[in-house]
């Protein structure tokens, strides 16, 4: 058992959240560089000579320079073993991002210092609030002209409702960016440009009152001392207990592109972020140091290897230890399975996992039996809770250019819906197929993947659907009557759950008034 505890205590599992273009994929690259996982970091829209960013490994992502799927990367840093989950920054992929946030113990929030708190960041922070996830903040892009740092922190506090404790502080910005002052260590780290792709020694000056500071940065030294007087009086001190409750965020400044300040964030995550936490189930709380293995699936990714049409289920280990060849109990279908070929990840590069501990993410080969939200144990029957499905906000009817490929279309759509890329609805009264998504880009992705992976050419048509709700009723007779009277608005989703497809919000509200015994749910547990 003590061996298990040592491994659990080493783990730090976190995700990076941000508004699109705040620099999240770049920071992922630099974090991996510090973890020795990459020798030279790639940039997303690199020059011809630049490498493609490691975490954007799907063809469509490489073409567009955006992160669409969730990548998982593991690397050692500072005596810890860090699991980084890179989430899609593009606003159209919030469902996938949301589910990823159920698999981590802390988050790194990246903010563009020229723009401040943006809409997508606000939405993602609402999600982290549901589980009081601890948040570390990185104010990025100091190599550009930025807003006043105190204003930035005020905005985070007022808009995101979380106290800010500055750990590092910028000295100048844009062309005048000189470096950062580490408040807790009382040292200035000087900035040099052109070092973004590698790790090199930086010049460090110990002590804010060190005369060497004037020699290095001139009048900025006196400005820094004045600013620090103000900052110390106006901001919160770091409080570890408040951080762990999600009430306070340590704030770091830097530039991911210039690879400056990223090591400070990693130091903070290793020192302060929680080790793997207990997890709720429908029967009890599962502790990470329990002897028996448990885990849950938070994502399914199809076709990670275009050479083999495969699907991989991403599982967060919650307790015990995975060993190659072990027997697991797949709770939902009530079957035992031997797992000898689970995977670990380095963003698309996969290796066979010999062992895994709580906080680790492993991949299980999935031949159509595993769904998002599935629980695996060593025999105990319970279900981990808190992996939700959201009602889509946009709908299209999908049809084929070649009607003979209906079977392939349905297979492709069901697989993509199980993976969480899109939701599929089959109306009870017609042969239509309706696709639901959170944003327009998802529709494009689905058509692209149907063509490249299933050889199916599909096109969309508009459809008068405003929203969808999952419907439940404890009284079987009333549910049957509802089905009979409202069949023109009912459909089955990809998991055969009964769904109400509302043409307008007015229609939905009227139906909710007319059938008070029926529950119309906006979210559904997987």
Curated annotation (Swiss-Prot):
Alphabetic keyword roster: Cytoplasm, GTP-binding, Nucleotide-binding, Protein biosynthesis
Pfam families: EF-G_D2 (PF22042), GTP_EFTU (PF00009), RF3_C (PF16658)
Protein localization: Cytoplasm
Molecular function terms, GO-annotated: GTP binding; GTPase activity; guanosine tetraphosphate binding; translation release factor activity, codon nonspecific; translation release factor activity, codon specific
Cystine residue pairs: none
Domain called tr-type G: residue spans: 9-277
Gene3D superfamilies reported for this sequence: P-loop containing nucleotide triphosphate hydrolases, Peptide chain release factor 3, domain III
Chain residues that bind GTP: 18-25, 86-90, 140-143
Family classification: Belongs to the TRAFAC class translation factor GTPase superfamily. Classic translation factor GTPase family. PrfC subfamily.
Name listed for the protein in its UniProt record: Peptide chain release factor 3
Species of provenance: Shewanella baltica (strain OS155 / ATCC BAA-1091)
Gene this protein is translated from: prfC
